[in-house]
């Protein structure tokens, strides 16, 4: 099954929030995980805001961005979608 991962779902999984089990279940069923190429900018922006708000450290921010990127098998150009 192809899964298109949205940044909000990735954040839920990374931070193991309330809906993370639901998202993880769907994510784990995926044989090909894709996301728009904007995913990288979006997840970086969200996590940078968490860092600026003092919710996560700079080191954690960098690691979580990498974790989010690593969740994706292929990035699809926005124009192709």
Per-segment meaning from a language model:
Residues 39-40, 60-81:
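Acidic catalytic patch
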Residues 1-38, 50-63:
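Short, well-structured N-terminal submotif of metal-dependent ribonuclease cores
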